[in-house]
Protein backbone atom coordinates (compact mmCIF):
# COMPACT_ATOMS: atom_id res chain seq x y z
CA UNK A 1 0.00 0.00 0.00
CA UNK A 2 1.56 3.24 -1.14
CA UNK A 3 0.80 6.59 0.42
CA UNK A 4 2.15 9.77 -1.12
CA UNK A 5 1.02 13.24 -0.11
CA UNK A 6 1.29 16.32 -2.31
CA UNK A 7 0.01 19.91 -2.04
CA UNK A 8 -1.20 21.60 -5.23
CA UNK A 9 -2.35 25.15 -4.68
CA UNK A 10 -5.05 24.73 -2.07
CA UNK A 11 -5.73 21.05 -2.85
CA UNK A 12 -4.18 18.15 -0.93
CA UNK A 13 -3.58 15.02 -3.00
CA UNK A 14 -3.00 11.56 -1.55
CA UNK A 15 -2.08 8.37 -3.31
CA UNK A 16 -3.77 5.45 -1.54
CA UNK A 17 -2.83 2.41 -3.61
CA UNK A 18 -0.97 1.35 -6.75
CA UNK A 19 -1.70 -2.08 -8.17
CA UNK A 20 -0.18 -4.04 -11.05
CA UNK A 21 -2.78 -5.74 -13.22
CA UNK A 22 -2.46 -7.85 -16.34
CA UNK A 23 -4.50 -8.66 -19.40
CA UNK A 24 -3.86 -12.02 -21.00
CA UNK A 25 -3.81 -11.99 -24.79
CA UNK A 26 -2.79 -14.50 -27.46
CA UNK A 27 0.85 -13.40 -27.32
CA UNK A 28 1.16 -13.36 -23.51
CA UNK A 29 0.36 -10.90 -20.76
CA UNK A 30 0.04 -7.12 -21.05
CA UNK A 31 0.96 -5.48 -17.74
CA UNK A 32 -0.55 -2.18 -16.64
CA UNK A 33 -0.94 -0.25 -13.40
CA UNK A 34 -3.90 1.16 -11.51
CA UNK A 35 -3.79 4.01 -9.00
CA UNK A 36 -6.34 5.11 -6.39
CA UNK A 37 -6.10 8.71 -5.19
CA UNK A 38 -8.06 11.19 -3.09
CA UNK A 39 -8.05 14.97 -3.40
CA UNK A 40 -9.44 17.53 -0.96
CA UNK A 41 -9.14 21.14 0.10
CA UNK A 42 -9.06 20.38 3.84
CA UNK A 43 -12.25 22.36 4.28
CA UNK A 44 -15.10 20.02 3.35
CA UNK A 45 -14.43 19.28 -0.32
CA UNK A 46 -13.22 15.80 -1.25
CA UNK A 47 -13.10 13.52 -4.30
CA UNK A 48 -11.49 10.26 -5.35
CA UNK A 49 -10.12 9.00 -8.64
CA UNK A 50 -9.10 5.66 -10.09
CA UNK A 51 -6.69 5.67 -13.03
CA UNK A 52 -5.16 2.95 -15.17
CA UNK A 53 -2.20 3.16 -17.54
CA UNK A 54 0.83 1.24 -18.79
CA UNK A 55 3.15 3.30 -16.53
CA UNK A 56 2.74 4.19 -12.82
CA UNK A 57 3.12 8.00 -13.17
CA UNK A 58 0.52 8.11 -15.96
CA UNK A 59 -1.93 6.06 -13.86
CA UNK A 60 -1.43 8.41 -10.89
CA UNK A 61 -1.91 11.49 -13.09
CA UNK A 62 -5.16 10.08 -14.56
CA UNK A 63 -6.44 9.24 -11.07
CA UNK A 64 -5.64 12.75 -9.77
CA UNK A 65 -7.48 14.37 -12.71
CA UNK A 66 -10.55 12.18 -12.13
CA UNK A 67 -10.46 12.98 -8.40
CA UNK A 68 -10.41 16.73 -9.11
CA UNK A 69 -13.40 16.37 -11.47
CA UNK A 70 -15.49 14.28 -9.04
CA UNK A 71 -15.37 16.38 -5.88
CA UNK A 72 -18.26 16.62 -3.41
CA UNK A 73 -18.87 19.14 -0.64
CA UNK A 74 -19.28 17.88 2.91
CA UNK A 75 -20.91 19.96 5.67
CA UNK A 76 -18.47 19.71 8.59
CA UNK A 77 -19.09 20.85 12.16
CA UNK A 78 -15.91 22.43 13.60
CA UNK A 79 -13.58 19.78 12.20
CA UNK A 80 -15.82 16.79 12.92
CA UNK A 81 -18.99 15.21 11.55
CA UNK A 82 -22.55 16.49 12.08
CA UNK A 83 -23.90 13.15 13.34
CA UNK A 84 -23.05 9.40 13.24
CA UNK A 85 -23.17 8.12 9.65
CA UNK A 86 -23.00 4.82 7.80
CA UNK A 87 -21.96 4.15 4.24
CA UNK A 88 -21.57 1.09 2.08
CA UNK A 89 -20.30 0.02 -1.29
CA UNK A 90 -20.42 -3.62 -2.44
CA UNK A 91 -18.89 -5.66 0.44
CA UNK A 92 -17.51 -2.73 2.43
CA UNK A 93 -19.44 -0.99 5.17
CA UNK A 94 -18.17 1.97 7.17
CA UNK A 95 -19.42 3.62 10.35
CA UNK A 96 -18.22 7.06 11.45
CA UNK A 97 -19.22 9.21 14.40
CA UNK A 98 -18.26 12.70 15.58
CA UNK A 99 -15.55 12.97 18.22
CA UNK A 100 -14.58 15.66 20.72
CA UNK A 101 -11.67 18.04 20.10
CA UNK A 102 -8.28 16.38 20.56
CA UNK A 103 -9.43 12.87 19.60
CA UNK A 104 -7.82 12.92 16.16
CA UNK A 105 -8.69 10.74 13.19
CA UNK A 106 -9.27 7.22 14.43
CA UNK A 107 -9.59 5.39 11.13
CA UNK A 108 -7.65 2.82 9.19
CA UNK A 109 -5.93 2.86 5.84
CA UNK A 110 -7.93 4.22 2.94
CA UNK A 111 -10.64 5.75 5.16
CA UNK A 112 -8.04 7.84 7.02
CA UNK A 113 -6.72 9.37 3.78
CA UNK A 114 -10.24 10.43 2.69
CA UNK A 115 -11.01 12.00 6.08
CA UNK A 116 -7.67 13.84 6.24
CA UNK A 117 -8.02 15.54 2.84
CA UNK A 118 -11.70 16.33 3.54
CA UNK A 119 -10.66 18.40 6.56
CA UNK A 120 -12.09 16.16 9.29
CA UNK A 121 -9.82 16.50 12.34
CA UNK A 122 -11.71 14.47 14.98
CA UNK A 123 -13.64 11.30 14.16
CA UNK A 124 -14.17 7.73 15.38
CA UNK A 125 -14.64 5.23 12.57
CA UNK A 126 -14.72 1.55 11.76
CA UNK A 127 -14.71 -0.41 8.50
CA UNK A 128 -16.64 -3.69 8.37
CA UNK A 129 -16.62 -6.42 5.74
CA UNK A 130 -14.25 -6.05 2.81
CA UNK A 131 -11.26 -3.78 3.41
CA UNK A 132 -10.48 -3.46 -0.31
CA UNK A 133 -9.22 0.17 -0.60
CA UNK A 134 -11.42 1.05 -3.59
CA UNK A 135 -14.60 -0.14 -1.88
CA UNK A 136 -13.67 1.47 1.47
CA UNK A 137 -13.03 4.84 -0.25
CA UNK A 138 -16.34 4.61 -2.13
CA UNK A 139 -18.21 3.67 1.08
CA UNK A 140 -16.58 6.56 3.00
CA UNK A 141 -17.45 9.09 0.29
CA UNK A 142 -21.01 7.66 0.17
CA UNK A 143 -21.37 8.18 3.93
CA UNK A 144 -19.97 11.73 3.81
CA UNK A 145 -22.23 12.64 0.86
CA UNK A 146 -25.33 11.47 2.76
CA UNK A 147 -24.50 13.48 5.90
CA UNK A 148 -27.03 16.26 6.56
CA UNK A 149 -26.33 19.55 8.32
CA UNK A 150 -28.89 20.91 10.82
CA UNK A 151 -29.69 23.68 8.31
CA UNK A 152 -30.57 21.11 5.61
CA UNK A 153 -32.77 19.10 8.00
CA UNK A 154 -34.53 22.27 9.23
CA UNK A 155 -35.22 23.40 5.65
CA UNK A 156 -36.70 20.00 4.72
CA UNK A 157 -38.92 19.90 7.80
CA UNK A 158 -39.95 23.55 7.58
CA UNK A 159 -38.60 24.32 11.06
CA UNK A 160 -35.88 26.50 12.51
CA UNK A 161 -32.41 25.21 13.35
CA UNK A 162 -33.09 25.79 17.08
CA UNK A 163 -36.15 23.49 16.93
CA UNK A 164 -34.07 20.78 15.25
CA UNK A 165 -31.19 20.98 17.73
CA UNK A 166 -33.60 21.14 20.68
UniProtKB/Swiss-Prot annotation:
Top-level taxon of origin: Bacteria
Pfam families found in the cross-reference section: Ribosomal_S5, Ribosomal_S5_C
BP terms from Gene Ontology: translation
Record domain S5 DRBM: where: 11-74
GO CC, alphabetical: small ribosomal subunit
MF terms in GO: rRNA binding; structural constituent of ribosome
Tagged with keyword GTP-binding: no
SUPFAM superfamilies hit by this protein: dsRNA-binding domain-like, Ribosomal protein S5 domain 2-like
Sorted UniProt keywords: Ribonucleoprotein, Ribosomal protein, RNA-binding, rRNA-binding
Entry annotated with the keyword rRNA-binding: yes
Entry-linked HAMAP family: Ribosomal_uS5_B
PANTHER family recorded: MITOCHONDRIAL RIBOSOMAL PROTEIN S5 (PTHR48277:SF1)
Quaternary structure, from the entry: Part of the 30S ribosomal subunit. Contacts proteins S4 and S8.
Function text: With S4 and S12 plays an important role in translational accuracy.
NCBIfam families named among the record's database cross-references: rpsE_bact
Domain notes: The N-terminal domain interacts with the head of the 30S subunit; the C-terminal domain interacts with the body and contacts protein S4. The interaction surface between S4 and S5 is involved in control of translational fidelity.
Family per similarity comment: Belongs to the universal ribosomal protein uS5 family.
UniProt-recorded name of the protein: Small ribosomal subunit protein uS5
Organism: Histophilus somni (strain 2336)
Lineage, top ranks: Bacteria, Pseudomonadati, Pseudomonadota, Gammaproteobacteria, Pasteurellales
Gene (UniProt): rpsE
Amino acid sequence: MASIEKQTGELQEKLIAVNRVSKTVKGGRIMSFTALTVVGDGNGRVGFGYGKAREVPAAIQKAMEKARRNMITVALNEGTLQHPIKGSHTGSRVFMQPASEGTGIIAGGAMRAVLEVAGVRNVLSKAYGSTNPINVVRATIDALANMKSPEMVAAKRGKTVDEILG
